Amino acid sequence: MPQYRSRTSTHGRNMAGARALWRATGMGDADFGKPIIAIANSFTQFVPGHVHLKDLGQLVAREIEAAGGVAKEFNTIAVDDGIAMGHGGMLYSLPSRELIADAVEYMVNAHCADALVCISNCDKITPGMLMAAMRLNIPTIFVSGGPMEAGKYIADGETRAADLITAMVVAADPTKTDEQAAVMERSACPTCGSCSGMFTANSMNCLTEALGLALPGNGSLLATHADRKRLFVEAGWQIVDLARRYYEQDDEGVLPRRIGGFKAFENAMSLDIAMGGSTNTVLHLLAAAREAELDFTMADIDRLSRRVPNLCKVSPSVSNVHMEDVHRAGGIMGILGALDRAGLIHRDCATVHEKTIGEAIDRWDVMRGGETAKTLYSAAPGGVRTTEAFSQSRRYESLDLDREKGVIRDAEHAFSKDGGLAVLYGNIALDGAIVKTAGVDASILVFEGPARIFESQEDAVAGILGDRVKAGDVVLIRYEGPKGGPGMQEMLYPTSYLKSKGLGKSCALITDGRFSGGTAGLSIGHISPEAAQGGAIGLVEEGDIIAIDIPNRKLDVKLDEATLEARRAAMEAKGKAAWKPAARERVVSAALQAYAALTTSAANGAVRDVTQVQRGR
C-alpha cells in the first residue's frame, strides 16, 4: 500500500520544523492526516486565456477542502503565443513548455504533494503540465480555462464570425482600409478564454478529454459560460477521491500513466486527426508520451492518419466554425462518439471520471446520451465583451445533431477519408514532417514549385510583403527548428501574409520551424532533421524544385542523391560555419542557448536530452 507522499513532511518528531511551517500556512493537527493536493494555476494578466483564472484556483481549493483534502495553490508562467508572434518573443514560446513542466515538478516534489489539479489553458501551458503529470505520475486532473467566444462583425448586412487570424489577415491586406482593419481588430477577440478556433490551446484541451485526464466539456465549453464552473467544482471533489483510491486502496488505475497509456494516446491522436487539430499537438503528444515512458512515435501518428477520417473542420480550416459551434454539436464527446461508431476508439481506456472512456462516450455523446449531456452542450455564447469567467448563462434553442452535413460528421459522411493531419517523408524530411491536411485546399494536395529560400522568419515576412514570392512558389524557411532558432518559432505571420496577398491557394510554405494552430493552407512544418542538425533542408538552393504529394505522404527536393551528397560535402567543408544561416543577426540569450544545447528533433517532440550532458562529462 503506497504511503501518502505528504507524510514525509507532516509525520514524525523530526519533522517538527516542517509542521511548524505548514501551520504558518493555516494548517492544524487535523490536516496532517489528509491528502495534500497541489493546484498548479497559470493565472496571468498577459494572456486572455488566463486572465480569468485568478480566483479559480481558490474555487477548486474550497471544494478540495470540503471533500476532506488540504489544497495548496501555486502558479506557473504562461506565454501568449499571439502576442509573442512575429518578433523575438516567439523564440521563448516552446522553451517555456519545459520550464512549466519543471516548475510543476519542482513545486510538487519539493513539498511532497499527494495529487495535482492542473488549471491550464493556452498553447504551452497545457502541454507543459501534461508532461509534468506524466513525469510525476501522481493522481492528476486537468481543468482548463475554456475557449473564447468567437468575434462577430457585420459584412454585407450579415453577422459573421471572426478570430485572431481574421484580424491578422485583414490588417496585412492592402485592399482593406484602416477603418476595416480597426473594426476587425476590435471584433476578433471579445472575451477571456483561449482563442476561439481549433488552434493549439483548444486542441490540447480537447486532447486531455480523450486521454481521460479531464472532465467532459473541458475542451469546448466556453470560458464565459456559467456551466463551466461545474468543471472546477467537480475537479476539486474528484481529485480527493482519486488520491484516496490510490493511497488508501492501492488503486494504481487512477495514475496518469495508467489512464494515459499507449491506447489512450492512440485515442487522443485519433481525435486530433479527426478534428484537424493544430500541428503543434504532434510535438506535445510525443513529448508527453516520452515523459510517460511510452514508445509512441511519428510512425504511430502516420499509421493513425491513414485510417482515421476528418470528421470536423474548425477555424482556421474553415472561417465560419469555431469552438462554440463544436460544443453545440456535442463537443469532444460527440467526435469521440462518431469515432467509436466507426470502431476507431479503444473503449476500455480509463478516465478520471468514468470507469472507461467507452462508458463516458455512452453517457456524454449527445447522439446516445440523455438530457444531462444535451444540457451540457446547449451552453451558448453570451455575445458580451468580458474578462470574467462564468459571466453568462445563455443557451442554444437546439443542438446541431446533423451528422451528415453538420459541424461533426459521421465516418460515412466525413470531410475526407484521410484525417486532418498527415506525416510526410522524403529526401528533405527523412524523419518526417507534419501538415494539417484539413486546412489544405483539395486543388493543391499535390504541388510542385521552385524554392524561395529564407533563413529566418523575419526575412520570409519581408520577402512575402515585398512581392518576392509569386504564385507557384514554395517558400522555404530554415534554421528555425528547435536548435536552429532556437525555440522553433511559429510561422503564423508568413502564412497569414500569403493569404493577404492572395497566394493562400497557389503557394506552399515548408519549414523546420512550426506553425501556429491558426495556420491553414499548404503549410508543412517540423521538417526533420532540421537544418541546424544537418538536415537536407539546409542543402536546398534557390530555385530547386520542391515536390509535395500529400495523398502519397511525400516531400522531396527533385535532386539526385549524388547532387545532395556533393552539397553536403561542401557544407561540411565550411567547418564552424556549417549548418548555420549565412547572414542572420539574432540575439540569443543565455537561457535560449541552454535550451538549444539540450533540445532534440521535432520528430522526438523537441524534448530535452540530458544524456548529451552526461556524455560530455
UniProtKB/Swiss-Prot annotation:
Enzyme class at the top of the EC tree: lyase
The entry's keywords: 2Fe-2S, Amino-acid biosynthesis, Branched-chain amino acid biosynthesis, Iron, Iron-sulfur, Lyase, Magnesium, Metal-binding
Cofactor info, note text: Binds 1 [2Fe-2S] cluster per subunit. This cluster acts as a Lewis acid cofactor.
InterPro entries recorded: Dihydro-acid_dehy_C, DihydroxyA_deHydtase, DiOHA_6PGluconate_deHydtase_CS, ILV_EDD_C, ILV_EDD_N, IlvD/EDD_N
Reactions catalysed: (2R)-2,3-dihydroxy-3-methylbutanoate = 3-methyl-2-oxobutanoate + H2O; (2R,3R)-2,3-dihydroxy-3-methylpentanoate = (S)-3-methyl-2-oxopentanoate + H2O
GO cellular component assignments: cytosol
Cofactor(s) the record lists: [2Fe-2S] cluster; Mg(2+)
Descriptive protein name: Dihydroxy-acid dehydratase
Species assigned in the record: Acidiphilium cryptum (strain JF-5)
The gene coding this protein: ilvD
